Every structure is written in C-alpha cells, then in structure tokens.
Amino acid sequence: MPSLSKEAALVHDALVARGLETPLRPPMDELDNETRKSLIAGHMTEIMQLLNLDLSDDSLMETPHRIAKMYVDEIFAGLDYANFPKITLIENKMKVDEMVTVRDITLTSTCEHHFVTIDGKATVAYIPKDSVIGLSKINRIVQFFAQRPQVQERLTQQILTALQTLLGTNNVAVSIDAVHYCVKARGIRDATSATTTTSLGGLFKSSQNTRQEFLRAVRHHP
C-alpha cells in the first residue's frame, strides 16, 4: 500500500491479521479518483435509465455525477487508507491511568447490504499507557471507518483495533448505538428500533468494575 502514513499501514495490517478488514478485492489496475468517478457516473446513468428516469430533466441530469463524487470523496472515502486521519500522540508524562471517554460521537455510515444509511452515535474509552491521543483524532478515526459500506459489528471492532494498535494498549472500549435505514425505511419498516454493539479489550473485558464504569458512561449514568 504505497504512500500511506505509518499509522495507516499499521492499522490496516492489524485489521487484516485479525480478519476484520472490510472485504475488498485486489484492484484490477490503478485508477485515479477522477476516473473512478467517471466510471461510476456512467453506471449510475444506466441504473437511472433502467428505472425510466428522464436524465434530460434539469433536476436529474447531474445526479449520476453527484452520486459518483459523493461515493468517492465522501461516504466511501474510508475505503482509501490515503484518507486515514493524521494521528497526534503525546507522551503520557502526566501518568494518566484512569479511563478517558469520548461520548456521543456523531456517526453516519452506509449499510453494505442495501447501501442505505446507518445513523447513530459512538462512545469510545481507553486507559492510557505510554501515550495519549488528541481527542479529536478519536472522532476522526470513528468517521474514517464509518465512511465505508459497513456492518455495525465489524465497524465497532475496527475502531477498537485501530485504537489498540495506535495507543499500544488493549485497554480500549467502543460502543455504537445506531438506527439502520434498511430496517427503518424498507422491509419490516420499524421506525423506532436501534442496534447497540459493544467491543471491549483488556481491562474493559477482564475487570467488572472497569466494564461497568464504561457502560455507565455509555448510558450517561453518574
């Protein structure tokens, strides 16, 4: 994987080793993003025409190009590790050894089964070892992995593994609560249910007190 940051390469390798990487085929050839957009727009044009939509209408004529740009630059940008966030780690000179929690991180992803929205929030916690991470970097890591076709269970574990790898500690916990529009907008059409997934590592798994402290933070209980 050329031209990747050290952190991006480490995270990718860790996910592959654990069988947690998003299913990706080896590229047939190297395509730049503009070529990808052009090809996607062409296929989207065919799909819309098969749906009997009139692409000569001024409301629809740019839709294939808008969708292609959205896929490559926005909602599926996390498929490209060149977009992995720049990571800031700080030596833990303060000797912080208590739980650090970032709660209610906005999360918007896409269901890989139907390509419709997953909308929710994530809570991430870790117990520092040798390093602490810039807080906004946790949000960016969540968003990076959300910007892929996903299943929520894998997304939760990808975030956990990425942070364990970068921070050099197993003491990480991730919880995601989300609404799946493949459930809300089609099929069963259940507008009120939500899905919660949790992935725990290190003390968050082995220590009942640490686990309960994290779960109280997830539930916003004092």
From Swiss-Prot:
Pfam families, per the entry: GTP_cyclohydroI (PF01227)
GO function terms (MF aspect): GTP binding; GTP cyclohydrolase I activity; zinc ion binding
EC class (word): hydrolase
S-S bonds: none
Keywords linked to the UniProt accession: Allosteric enzyme, GTP-binding, Hydrolase, Metal-binding, Nucleotide-binding, One-carbon metabolism, Zinc
UniProt catalytic activity: GTP + H2O = 7,8-dihydroneopterin 3'-triphosphate + formate + H(+)
InterPro entries documented for this protein: GTP-CH-I_C/QueF, GTP-CH-I_N, GTP_CycHdrlase_I, GTP_CycHdrlase_I_CS, GTP_CycHdrlase_I_dom
GO cellular component: cytoplasm
Keyword match Methyltransferase: no
Binding site for Zn(2+): 111, 114, 182
E.C. number(s) listed in UniProt: 3.5.4.16
Metabolic or biological pathway, per its Swiss-Prot or TrEMBL entry: Cofactor biosynthesis; 7,8-dihydroneopterin triphosphate biosynthesis; 7,8-dihydroneopterin triphosphate from GTP: step 1/1
A GO biological process held by the record: one-carbon metabolic process
Record comment: activity regulation: Allosteric enzyme. Activity is modulated by K(+), divalent cations, UTP, and tetrahydrobiopterin. Tetrahydrobiopterin is an inhibitor of this enzyme.
Subunit field text: Toroid-shaped homodecamer, composed of two pentamers of five dimers.
Family membership noted in the UniProt record: Belongs to the GTP cyclohydrolase I family.
Protein name as catalogued: GTP cyclohydrolase 1
Organism: Salmonella typhimurium (strain LT2 / SGSC1412 / ATCC 700720)
